[in-house]
Amino acid sequence: MDTPTPNITNEALTVRGKERYRSGVLEYRKMGYWEPDYEPKITDVISLFRITPQDGVDPVEAAAAVAGESSTATWTVVWTDRLTACEKYRAKAYRVDPVPNAPGQYFAYIAYDLALFEPGSIANLTASIIGNVFGFKPLKALRLEDMRLPVAYVKTFDGPATGIVVERERLDKFGRPLLGATVKPKLGLSGRNYGRVVYEALKGGLDFTKDDENINSQPFMHWRDRFLYCMEAVNKAQAATGEVKGTYLNVTAGTMEDMYERASFAHELGSSIIMIDLVIGYTAIQSMSKWARKHDMILHLHRAGHGTYTRHKTHGVSFRVISKWMRLAGVDHIHAGTVVGKLEGDPLTTRGFYDILREDYNETRYEHGIFFDQDWAGTRKVMPVASGGIHAGQMHQLLHHLGEDVVLQFGGGTIGHPQGIAAGAMANRVALEAMILARNEGRDYLAEGPQILNDAARHCLPLRQALDTWGEVTFNYASTDTPDFVPTAMPAY
């Protein structure tokens, strides 16, 4: 019996009950990348994009194009699609909402089958989600606002080796934020003078000091000298205070071999923590996380470079997404904003970053910029770090906005103290202890904060001097990244 000839039309060819398009260029929505009735599976990776189509480009077609270009599509129909389970592997845009008060911008929800991604690889995930699609001409701008990572995918990553609870147990410090300071000036000090700064700050009351993002191994100070002098300072400060202390030794370098060498030397010297920069890349971050886990060390990540793609509201990647990726990658610390400091940080948006890093389960909170429930499936928590333009006079605000599971990094607010580094450290420690005591007594420490600090300063001259020096310093600039969200009653396309 002859096989019936398939019904051929000008637009499509039917083969075994499936629709296959002729060669040529078709709209993405007609190629299967727009499915408004699609119900995401529990195992799907879901991305929320803010899309700004070019003039005349339909937002649904733009969303379908993003789905296609971030998964299986190219600019024309290819017959080799039929050699794959293309219906499974195509990403599916299933919802498009206008962004409130932002004409021409839309939130596009896109689901990806889990089989599209290599287990345990941030590099592979990002090659699709933020790959070529970000240069796509039909879009004026594209921003990845949030992601829902399924448990089946989360469990392919180790996550932080230490996490908040274990770090506190190692330090034997509970019930308050940890205190730190970045050594200043960040560049130019000799190894010996650098070590003196570390000792004075730790002896004065801080828990940590740290290298800044761009101190590696320059002509004025070789990395090995810095490590030696810093660890000598840590050991002396521990002996003088009876407390566990630490300093973040930046092992960032030009090659993985150099980073491993520096990390190994820090481990030999007895350091409990090493530091890397975000700019080393996702694969290098995961590699250093694996090394830190093997050697039982805390891994601190400085988010150097993030502002190049997280700060612009319509194009790039939100830092809430970077926070999720870094929790998967396995860092123990990450800089996550201060709210009141000198760096970009809308209060509600910043709280959303902290929620992602510190909660076992993130519930949808549109006001914090969190668009999806996220189950971390037992992945350890990341300790957020607040740094950049903060000082003792803001202690009540910092505690209110950021909570107690955070490292407060007072760089200039320690080293710039008029009576010296140790006095600056003491001022910060006394301010923190006074605020924690007020909180534990049930006082409204946010409203009473200035009075609490002034009362404590009556018995602590360094705190009095800190308040007199910086008490009126603020950085009140409008944030460029605020949590736009779609009310549940707003109709979708």
Curated annotation (Swiss-Prot):
Protein name as catalogued: Ribulose bisphosphate carboxylase large chain
Subunit note: Heterohexadecamer of 8 large chains and 8 small chains.
EC number: 4.1.1.39
Entry binding sites for Mg(2+): 210, 212-213
Matches recorded under HAMAP family: RuBisCO_L_type1
Residue numbers of N6-carboxylysine PTMs: 210
Cofactor needs: Mg(2+)
Organism: Acidiphilium cryptum (strain JF-5)
Comment on bound cofactor: Binds 1 Mg(2+) ion per subunit.
Entry similarity comment: Belongs to the RuBisCO large chain family. Type I subfamily.
Job description of the protein: RuBisCO catalyzes two reactions: the carboxylation of D-ribulose 1,5-bisphosphate, the primary event in carbon dioxide fixation, as well as the oxidative fragmentation of the pentose substrate. Both reactions occur simultaneously and in competition at the same active site.
Note: The basic functional RuBisCO is composed of a large chain homodimer in a 'head-to-tail' conformation. In form I RuBisCO this homodimer is arranged in a barrel-like tetramer with the small subunits forming a tetrameric 'cap' on each end of the 'barrel'.
Cystine bridges: none
Record-annotated active site: 184, 302
Record keyword rRNA-binding present: no
Binding site for substrate: 132, 182, 186, 303, 335, 387
